[in-house]
């Protein structure tokens, strides 16, 4: 897995890593407890600008459910979105624009 971007905004640190040619991991770490108004300040890595829009996005990090809702909407234009679940050792596909991965599939990887 190779890191392609590290960035941060006022409230979140972001790390973008290529899992493979088809999948990109976006990890986030909150700098403090969030309040709903913080969604106006959050600036996730842009999939088009950073050239990973043609991949599945895996989201990983501790945050409120409404932050995940925001991120899933933000990354909707990508190939699909999964949410990492350490109990499953992979990411559950929650949105897909590909016939190769369906909602409910688990994306697994080594490393």
Swiss-Prot record:
To A.fulgidus AF1864. It comes from Aquifex aeolicus (strain VF5). Pfam families: Cas_csx3. InterPro entries: CRISPR-assoc_prot_Crn3/Csx3 (IPR013409). The lineage of its organism: Bacteria, Pseudomonadati, Aquificota, Aquificia, Aquificales. This is Uncharacterized protein aq_377. It comes from the Bacteria.
């Amino acid at each position: 897995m190779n890191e392609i971007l590290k960035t941060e905004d006022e409230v979140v640190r972001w790390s973008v890593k290529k899992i493979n040619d088809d999948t990109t991991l976006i990890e986030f770490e909150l700098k403090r407890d969030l309040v709903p108004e913080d969604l106006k300040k959050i600036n996730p890595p842009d999939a088009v600008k950073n050239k990973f829009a043609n991949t599945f996005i895996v989201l990983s990090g501790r945050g409120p459910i409404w932050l995940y809702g925001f991120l899933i909407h933000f990354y909707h234009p990508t190939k699909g979105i999964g949410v990492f679940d350490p109990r499953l050792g992979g990411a559950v596909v929650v949105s897909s624009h590909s016939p190769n991965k369906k909602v409910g599939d688990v994306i697994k990887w080594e490393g």
